[in-house]
Structure formats: structure tokens, C-alpha cells
């Protein structure tokens, strides 16, 4: 039972019941929340092309997920980190500290970089997302990389 799992917790790829079951069985130390997002994430005006511009795949983004144009299957995720956090808090019994760990320290442990990422501590990289919560919705307020504030887009 030492294996870890990666979940696209966007509210589309996996149902709430499965997210809750995996949380109960594995716990936050064995779950990494991943966006697995395509280049269509955050775009507002179609068309959306994933892959290369020349030979890429056109996709349709509806209700927070990318589909093939004929809607025969998902074509990837368009979820962002704030959405994963919101989804886990809304659809599962996860606490805020548990959900944040699944987005930070657990992935860092899986990647073997938990000696410098995944925590806020002296001597660590200081890559930080500052979230806010309004009316139950999580939003990204500020982003720091190496302790430096990134300009807003």
C-alpha cells in the first residue's frame, strides 16, 4: 500500500464519491492533486488547439473540461490549481490543510524535491501561491517564485 496516486480533482474527470473514497483509503500523504491541464487552460476565446499550432488537435471547452469536437471523449483538463483546491473542499471531507498538502508537499515528495519545495520554511525555495476565498470560491491572489512576486497577467 506504499503507492501514491495522482488525481485530476476538477469535478469532471472523477466523481465526488471516488475522490472521497481515495482520500479515505490513501490519505493526503499518498495523494497528489494534479491539473494535467492543456494549453487551453485559462483561455477565453476559441478556437482551442492543443499540441502544436501546425498539427495540433482542435478541442471544445465546455463546463470546465476540454472535449474532442465531436464530444466523443475528454481531450484533456483545463483545471487550474485553485480549481483543484475548491473542488476537493467542496466535494470531499478534505480539510484545507489536507487539500493544500495534496497540492504541495505530496507532489514534491513524489518528485524527490521535498528538501526544498512543498513547505514554507527558512532556506526553502519560497515558491508560494497566495489564495483568497470569497463565497466559497478559491482564487489565486498572488504568486511568488523564489520569493519574488510575479506580475499579474
Task: List the model feature ranges, each with a label.
Residues 135-143:
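Short, Lys/Arg- and Gly-enriched loop/turn segments at beta-strand edges
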Residues 1-11, 18, 23-35, 40-122, ...:
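His/Asp/Glu-enriched, well-ordered alpha-helical/loop segment
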Residues 11-12, 136:
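Short beta->alpha junction loops/turns
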Amino acid at each position: 500500500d506504499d503507492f501514491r496516486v495522482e488525481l485530476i480533482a476538477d469535478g469532471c474527470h472523477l466523481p465526488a464519491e471516488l475522490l472521497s473514497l481515495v482520500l479515505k483509503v490513501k490519505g493526503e500523504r499518498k495523494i497528489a492533486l494534479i491539473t494535467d491541464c492543456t494549453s487551453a487552460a485559462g483561455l477565453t476565446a476559441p478556437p482551442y488547439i492543443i499540441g502544436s499550432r501546425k498539427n495540433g488537435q482542435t478541442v471544445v471547452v465546455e463546463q470546465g473540461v476540454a472535449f474532442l469536437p465531436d464530444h466523443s471523449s475528454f481531450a484533456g483538463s483545463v483545471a487550474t490549481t485553485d480549481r483543484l483546491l475548491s473542488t476537493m473542499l467542496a466535494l470531499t471531507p478534505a480539510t484545507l490543510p489536507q487539500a493544500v498538502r495534496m497540492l504541495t508537499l505530496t507532489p514534491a515528495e513524489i518528485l524527490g524535491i521535498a528538501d526544498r519545495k512543498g513547505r514554507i520554511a527558512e532556506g526553502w525555495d519560497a515558491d508560494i501561491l497566495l489564495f483568497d476565498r470569497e463565497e466559497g470560491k478559491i482564487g489565486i491572489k498572488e504568486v511568488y517564485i523564489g520569493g519574488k512576486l510575479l506580475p499579474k497577467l
